[in-house]
Amino acid sequence: MQERHTEQDYRALLIADTPIIDVRAPIEFEQGAMPAAINLPLMDNDERAAVGTCYKQQGSDAALALGHKLVAGEIRQQRMYAWRAACLQNPQGILCCARGGQRSHIVQRWLHEAGIDYPLVEGGYKALRQTAIQATIELAQKPIVLIGGCTGSGKTLLVQQQPNGVDLEGLARHRGSAFGRTLQPQLSQASFENLLAAEMLKTDARQDLRLWVLEDESRMIGSNHLPECLRERMTQAAIAVVEDPFEIRLERLNEEYFLRMHHDFTHAYGDEQGWQEYCEYLHHGLSAIKRRLGLQRYNELAAQLDTALTTQLTTGSTDGHLAWLVPLLKEYYDPMYRYQLEKKAEKVVFRGEWAEVAVWVKAQ
C-alpha cells in the first residue's frame, strides 16, 4: 500500500481536500484536526487514557494488550463497520493517527483483513500539522493588500470576490466584532490554523499568485488569533480603505445582523426558540461593550434594542434597530476604527467607495 511521506505529498493532501479518516481519540481531534478529516477513533477518550496509564506503569506490550482487550468483540465490530463505510464512501481517502504509529497501522491491518486496502499518512497528524505551519510561514511572505473601512463597508464581500482573497473571518467563523459570532462554533486554534493553511495552499495552487487580498483584521478574530507570521506581515501591508456613504453601510448591517441572523436562528432552532436565540445574540453583543459605552449609555441603547425587538416581533420591520445602531456606530465603532486607522495612515494607498476599491484591487 502506497504511503504518503514527503512534504509535497502532505501539501497535496491539503490542496485536494483529501478525506482523512482520523482514528485518534475525540479529545485529540477536538484539540486540532485537518479540514477534511472525520473522527472515527480506534479508542474513545477513556480507553485511550487507560492505555496511556498502562503504558507508563507496565510498558508498551502491556498497553498494546490492554488496547486489544478494550477494543474487541462488539465494540471492534461497530468501529470496523464505521471505518469500512467511510472507506467505501471515500475511496480516495487516507488513514491518520497522531504520528503514523500503531493506531493507524492497526486499523489499516484490520481493514486489509476485511478486504479493504487503504493508505495511511506516514508521520500522522503531527506531520500534516508541521506542513500546515510551514506552508503558512512560506505563503505569508507574498505581498499583501488589506481592505479596510468602517463597520458595514462590505470589506468581507470584497475580499471574497477576489481570486487571490482569503476570507479570514469566514475561516474563523466569526466576524470580528462584539456582534461577530455566527451559528457555527469556532474551531480550536490549531484547527483554525490548519484550515487557513489549506485555504492559502489551495488559493496559491489555482493561479500564479502575486499578492494576497485580506481584510484588515486585528490579531484576534473571536477566540481565534492569526498566526504570528501572517499577523506580522499584515502590519507591514498596504491598505485600501472603503469609504461608503453611511446609509449604504446601514443597509448592509441591517441585512447582515438583523435580517440574516434572524433567518439563520429561526432556521436552526424554529420560530420560538430561534427568536429567543436571536434576541440573546443581540443583547450579548451589546453587553460585551458595556464597559466601553459606560453604564448609562449602555442602558439607554439596551432599552432601545428591546423596543426594536418588540417592533420586529409584532410587525416584522427591522427599522426600529436604527435607534440604537446609528448612535452605536457614530459614538463607538466609527471613532474606534478611525483612531486605529490614524495609527497606520502611512500604509493607506487608496481610498474610495466599494466599487472603486474593487476595481483598484483587481488592477494590482
UniProtKB/Swiss-Prot annotation:
InterPro entries: Rhodanese-like_dom (IPR001763), Rhodanese-like_dom_sf (IPR036873), SelU (IPR017582). Its EC number is 2.9.1.3. One of its GO terms (biological process) is tRNA wobble uridine modification. It catalyses: 5-methylaminomethyl-2-thiouridine(34) in tRNA + selenophosphate + (2E)-geranyl diphosphate + H2O + H(+) = 5-methylaminomethyl-2-selenouridine(34) in tRNA + (2E)-thiogeraniol + phosphate + diphosphate; 5-methylaminomethyl-2-thiouridine(34) in tRNA + (2E)-geranyl diphosphate = 5-methylaminomethyl-S-(2E)-geranyl-thiouridine(34) in tRNA + diphosphate; 5-methylaminomethyl-S-(2E)-geranyl-thiouridine(34) in tRNA + selenophosphate + H(+) = 5-methylaminomethyl-2-(Se-phospho)selenouridine(34) in tRNA + (2E)-thiogeraniol; 5-methylaminomethyl-2-(Se-phospho)selenouridine(34) in tRNA + H2O = 5-methylaminomethyl-2-selenouridine(34) in tRNA + phosphate. One of its GO terms (molecular function) is transferase activity, transferring alkyl or aryl (other than methyl) groups. Keywords: Selenium, Transferase. The active site is at C97. It is an enzyme of class 2 (transferase). Gene3D superfamilies: Rhodanese-like domain (3.40.250.10). The keyword Transferase applies. Residues 14-137 form the Rhodanese domain. SMART domains: RHOD (SM00450). Involved in the post-transcriptional modification of the uridine at the wobble position (U34) of tRNA(Lys), tRNA(Glu) and tRNA(Gln). Catalyzes the conversion of 2-thiouridine (S2U-RNA) to 2-selenouridine (Se2U-RNA). Acts in a two-step process involving geranylation of 2-thiouridine (S2U) to S-geranyl-2-thiouridine (geS2U) and subsequent selenation of the latter derivative to 2-selenouridine (Se2U) in the tRNA chain. HAMAP family: tRNA_sel_U_synth. Belongs to the SelU family. Monomer. This is tRNA 2-selenouridine synthase. It comes from Shigella flexneri serotype 5b (strain 8401). The lineage of its organism: Bacteria, Pseudomonadati, Pseudomonadota, Gammaproteobacteria, Enterobacterales.
